[in-house]
Structures are given as structure tokens and as C-alpha cells.
């Protein structure tokens, strides 16, 4: 057990080495002297030199004292980044969070310091994670987004310093981590879940936990293991240094040991179910599906020509698939999935685009899910609102059911507060006028209910879950990554892997430029394309109907973790005296000693 704070604990000196240099060295009051005395005074230059030397010494000491935590915060953020694609060293997330935990549990770390170290950790994580944004809009929006997301890491750091005095702080740190990820996935403008720690685990064993609790439970396990490593390491190091002294208790390793063991045990219990689902065993119906990656022209074409060239490329690649089917080189697909924006020319209004798509559908003799841009209700030349849609295009009847994207991307597909932001940046005019659609998230092609999560939608937990609850037996992720780079596409593919395990469904990712893939319910890639080349995938999958615990109760799991984090934060605030000055509070023996 970790000892709690008692009333017998000595008060901590508030003026420790976390105080800014030079704030606690006021000059003493001069002693009274006779006015006839003629004391020898040092020269003015000497006094100034001494003053500068003292303050310089304190400043230097302060910098040296902070080198270790600053380096640890930066190193921790970089380690968490390494766990994400395209590098994908999933195991580095644990030492990354352990380093952050060490910084936040130092006795010298104040609440303001916790916020600052958290922001620094976040910057070291998000800046290298999101550089693909700069390819379209430049460095300023990329760095601004990285900083905005880092603020949530800062809020976590602030909360962590508040709760560190409570017994069992690694557990409370983990709940606060999940709460911070929920907050950044919700606010502002609908949130930005990109960078949730769960998505760095799609190549690791903890991915299995997505089946029972979704992305939040995976993030919780990552954080719990990481922060438990902080306490475990600190206790062992402290005991190594002081254990030879009489009366020194053994290190308190029970809590971190149990936390790590429990996480691994639950993972081991769930993995066999996940693995069995991915092998294709059972009575599930087997069907063949295809995904077409038509690719886009390189830079140099005028915008309208680019749109037409993209459509032509996808028609051409579908015709190649049809030829291979006739020649016996590929299996006949039941339906074909095209990427998002494969027809940016409105096929419901443009007869030529419609004819081209019909030609492709007739050639392959299967319905095609076409990613298109169509006019939305209320369209006017001054307000050119549109829907980002997926249309089921039948070989004989043409357009049928459609899914209008329900979660549209701020600052890309639409511009929040357009009247305000257009005065701040020339990039504002690049944002679209897309409006969210409505529906169940499911379309039917060849009698198969297909859940659609278009590009941006796949990173939000609710999108795929709604589709599966509404009967989807397979999930499709039409995506357009042509304006970004391969790193972004690799990161998005990780979201598809987690959704496959979370909902026990095959996931078919179709990208204009890649990476397209067919993902099994255990998260492994059955097939995939290379980046920036025309290609198609033609694979057999199984239609799944069972609902996982995460599908049924995932939001409840997240709510419990978030509420626990908020509740323990409130308890800690009351326990600490409502953010009273540090000289009036005591720190727990469980904090990491410097």
C-alpha cells in the first residue's frame, strides 16, 4: 500500500528549488549606526557586480535544476510520438508516459509547473506527429494546431500535480489522462481525437482491449502502465540508495505491480477471442469485395482538369479490375468501394460524369460506392453548400442509397466563424462549404449492409459504432489523402485497425492515393497498396453480425473513466485546501524524490 498523508507529516518548505531564482534573496535591513561613523563602503561598481553575480549564480542553478525535468518532458513526448505510425514503436509509449509521470511527481513541481511541463510534453509529441498539415496550408496552422492540442496535455499536467498527494496516484493519473483525451476529442469545434495514445498501439498487444472498451480503455491501459512504471522505478531506486539503513521499509511496489499485471492479464484473456475472429472461422458469410485506388495527377493541372482526371483514373482502374476478373486473374467482387472525392464533379448533375461511372459499374457488373461532392439543400451561388457523400451506383439503375458525411472537418471542409477567421488568414478562403448530413451511417450494396465512415469520421468513436448498431456487417473507410503525405495515411490506417478490433468487423480502406487496405477483425492487414500509385484490392472477407462489448457499452466505459478522473480531481482539490498556497499543504510520501 502507498502511505497516505497524515497530520504528523512535516510541512514542506515552500521556498524550495522550484522558486524562481532571485525571488527569495532580498537584501537585509541595514543596522542602525551613528551618523558620525564613517564606514568604508565598497565602490558602486563592486556592489553592482556582486548583485549580478549572486543573481547569475541563482539563475544558473535554477537552469541546471530544471534541465532534468525539461529534458524528461521533451523526451517523453518524443517517445510517445515514436509509438505512432509511420514508425510504430508501440512500446515506447510506456517509457514516454513514465518520464512525464516522473516530472509531474517531483516535489519541486508546482501546479503551474505541471501545466508548463505538460504543454512542453505535448509540443514534443504533436509537432512531429502533424507536419503533414503544413503541406497544404503552411507551417503556421500546423504549429498552431500542435500548440492547441498541447494545452490539453498541460491541463492533464495541472490536474496530475493536484492529485499526486492521494494514495494510488498512478491510477488517478490514468483516469485524468483519459479525461484529457476525451476533452480534446470534443472541444473545440467537435474536437480532434488525432493523437489519442490508443492509436499508437495498433501493432501491440494492448490493441485487444479495444474489443471490450474501445479506444478509451486502450488509452487507459497505456497510461496506467506508463505511470505505474514511474512509481515502480522511483521506489526501487530510492530503496537501492537507502535500503541499507536500519529501519528503512521495503519499496512500495504492490500497487504498480498489480496495475501492470492486471493490464497484461486482461489483455491475455481477450486476445484469443480477437485472434479467432481474425482467422475467419465460424459460419459467417464469405463475400469478395474490391477497393479501387485510382491515384491523382501530379501538380500542374488546373483545378477542373484535376477533378476530371481523378474521376477518369478511378474509372480506368475499375475497368482494369473488370478485365482481370474476365481473365480469371481476380475474383468477381460483390461490390466495389471508391475513395472519398473520387468524383468531385457532381455525378447527379453532370451527365458526363454519370455516364463514366455507369460504364465502370457495368464493366465490373457490381455496384460501386462512389465518393462524390453534391449540392446540399439551400445551395446558392453566394452560399455554395455541399455534401461530401458516398453514393451506391448500381450497374443498371444508377445512383441509389447514399451516406452524407455527418462529421465534417473544421478549417478544411468548412470554416467555423468564417466572418472572423477570414480576416486573420489568407488560407481561410480555401475552406469549403460542406454541411453535415443525416442518416444511419449504413448503405446497402448487393444486399449487404455497409457502414460508412468517410475519412475524418473514422477517428471519432461514435461514427463506426452508430453504423454497427444500425446493422453494418462490414465497415468502409473512403478517404482522400491526396493533399497530405504518406505519414498521414499511415496514421489514418491505424484508426481503421482499431475500429476493426473494436467492433469485430472487416474494414476496407479506399484512398485516392493510398494507403488502401483490407483489415481483418484482429487488426492485421490482409492486403494493402503502396503510396501514390494506381491499384486495386480484391479480397474475400466475412460478413459479421455479433456485437462486441465495446460496441454495446463503449461510451459507458469512457464515461466511467472520465467521471472517475474528474471526481478524484475534485476530491484532491478539497483535500489540498482548494489550491491553497504550498506552504499550507503537505506532500505525500508517494511523490518521487528528486
Swiss-Prot record:
Mutant phenotype after disruption: Not essential. Loss of N-acylation of apolipoproteins.
One GO MF term attached to the UniProt entry: N-acyltransferase activity
GO biological process, one term: lipoprotein biosynthetic process
Protein topology in the membrane: Multi-pass membrane protein
Primary residence: membrane
The enzyme's E.C. designation: 2.3.1.269
Sequence ranges on the Extracellular membrane side: 88-116, 161-221, 270-554
Limits of the CN hydrolase domain: 287-543
Compartments, as annotated in UniProt: Cell membrane
Active site as annotated: 340, 405, 455
Biased amino acid composition, Acidic residues: 1-29
Cytoplasmic face of the membrane: 1-67, 135-138, 240-251, 573-594
Region ranges (Disordered): 1-48
Pathway, per record: Protein modification; lipoprotein biosynthesis (N-acyl transfer)
Compositional bias segments (type: Basic and acidic residues): 30-40
Similarity section: Belongs to the CN hydrolase family. Apolipoprotein N-acyltransferase subfamily.
Subunit note: Interacts with Ppm1 (AC A0QZ12) upon coexpression in E.coli, which increases the PPM synthase activity of Ppm1.
Miscellaneous remark of the record: In a number of other Mycobacteria, including M.bovis and M.tuberculosis, this protein is the second domain in a 2 domain protein.
Protein name: Apolipoprotein N-acyltransferase
Organism name: Mycolicibacterium smegmatis (strain ATCC 700084 / mc(2)155)
Amino acid at each position: 500500500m502507498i502511505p497516505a498523508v497524515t497530520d504528523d507529516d512535516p510541512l514542506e518548505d515552500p521556498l524550495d528549488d522550484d522558486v524562481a531564482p532571485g525571488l527569495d534573496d532580498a537584501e537585509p535591513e541595514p543596522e542602525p549606526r551613528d551618523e558620525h561613523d564613517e564606514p568604508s563602503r565598497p565602490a558602486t561598481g563592486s556592489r553592482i557586480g556582486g548583485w549580478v553575480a549572486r543573481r547569475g549564480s541563482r539563475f544558473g542553478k535554477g537552469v541546471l535544476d530544471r534541465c532534468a525535468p525539461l529534458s524528461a518532458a521533451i523526451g517523453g513526448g518524443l517517445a510517445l510520438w515514436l509509438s505512432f505510425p509511420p514508425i510504430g514503436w508501440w512500446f515506447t509509449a510506456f517509457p514516454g508516459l513514465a518520464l512525464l509521470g516522473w516530472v509531474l511527481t517531483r516535489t519541486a513541481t508546482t501546479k503551474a509547473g505541471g501545466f508548463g511541463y505538460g504543454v512542453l510534453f505535448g509540443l514534443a509529441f504533436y509537432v512531429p506527429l502533424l507536419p503533414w498539415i503544413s503541406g497544404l496550408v503552411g507551417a503556421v496552422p500546423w504549429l498552431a494546431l500542435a500548440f492547441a492540442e498541447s494545452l490539453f496535455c498541460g491541463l492533464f499536467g495541472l490536474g496530475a500535480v493536484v492529485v499526486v498527494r492521494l494514495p494510488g496516484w498512478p491510477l488517478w493519473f490514468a483516469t485524468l489522462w483519459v479525461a484529457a483525451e476525451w476533452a480534446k476529442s470534443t472541444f473545440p469545434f467537435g474536437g480532434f481525437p488525432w493523437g489519442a495514445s490508443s492509436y499508437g498501439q495498433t501493432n501491440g498487444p494492448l490493441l485487444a482491449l479495444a474489443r471490450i472498451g474501445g479506444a478509451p480503455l486502450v488509452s487507459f491501459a497505456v497510461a496506467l502502465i506508463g505511470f505505474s512504471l514511474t512509481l515502480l522505478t522511483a521506489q526501487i531506486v530510492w530503496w537501492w540508495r537507502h535500503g541499507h539503513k536500519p529501519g528503512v521499509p521495503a519499496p512500495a511496489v504492490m500497487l504498480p505491480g498489480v496495475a501492470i499485471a492486471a493490464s497484461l492479464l486482461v489483455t491475455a484473456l481477450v486476445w484469443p477471442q480477437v485472434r479467432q475472429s481474425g482467422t475467419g472461422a465460424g459460419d459467417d458469410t464469405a463475400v469478395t469485395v474490391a477497393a479501387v485506388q485510382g491515384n491523382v495527377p501530379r501538380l500542374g493541372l488546373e483545378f477542373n482538369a484535376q477533378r476530371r482526371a481523378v474521376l477518369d483514373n478511378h474509372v480506368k482502374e475499375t475497368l482494369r479490375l473488370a478485365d482481370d476478373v474476365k481473365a480469371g486473374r481476380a475474383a468477381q467482387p460483390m461490390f466495389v468501394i471508391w475513395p472519398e472525392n473520387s468524383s468531385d464533379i457532381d455525378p447527379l448533375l453532370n451527365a458526363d460524369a454519370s455516364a463514366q461511372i455507369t460504364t465502370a459499374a457495368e464493366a465490373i457488373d457490381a455496384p460501386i460506392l462512389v465518393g462524390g461532392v453534391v449540392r446540399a439543400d439551400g445551395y446558392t451561388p453566394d452560399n455554395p453548400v455541399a455534401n461530401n457523400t458516398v453514393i451506391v451506383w448500381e450497374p443498371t439503375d444508377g445512383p441509389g442509397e447514399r451516406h452524407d458525411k455527418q462529421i465534417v472537418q473544421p478549417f478544411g471542409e468548412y470554416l467555423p466563424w468564417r466572418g472572423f477567421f477570414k480576416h486573420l488568414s489568407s488560407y481561410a478562403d480555401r475552406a469549403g462549404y460542406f454541411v453535415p448530413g443525416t442518416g444511419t451511417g449504413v448503405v446497402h450494396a448487393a444486399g449487404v449492409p455497409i457502414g460508412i465512415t468517410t475519412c475524418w469520421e473514422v477517428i471519432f468513436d461514435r461514427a463506426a459504432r452508430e453504423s454497427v448498431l444500425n446493422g453494418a456487417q462490414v465497415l468502409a473507410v473512403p478517404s482522400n489523402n491526396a493533399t497530405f503525405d504518406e505519414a498521414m495515411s499511415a496514421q489514418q490506417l491505424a484508426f481503421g485497425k482499431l475500429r476493426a478490433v473494436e467492433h469485430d468487423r472487416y474494414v476496407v480502406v479506399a484512398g485516392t492515393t493510398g494507403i488502401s487496405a483490407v483489415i481483418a477483425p484482429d487488426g492485421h492487414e490482409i492486403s494493402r497498396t503502396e503510396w501514390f500509385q494506381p491499384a486495386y484490392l480484391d479480397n474475400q472477407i466475412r460478413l459479421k453480425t455479433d456485437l462486441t462489448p465495446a460496441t454495446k457499452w463503449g461510451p459507458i466505459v469512457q464515461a466511467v473513466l472520465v467521471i472517475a478522473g474528474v471526481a478524484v480531481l475534485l476530491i484532491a482539490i478539497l483535500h489540498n485546501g482548494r489550491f491553497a498556497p504550498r506552504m499550507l499543504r503537505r506532500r505525500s510520501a508517494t511523490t518521487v524524490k528528486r
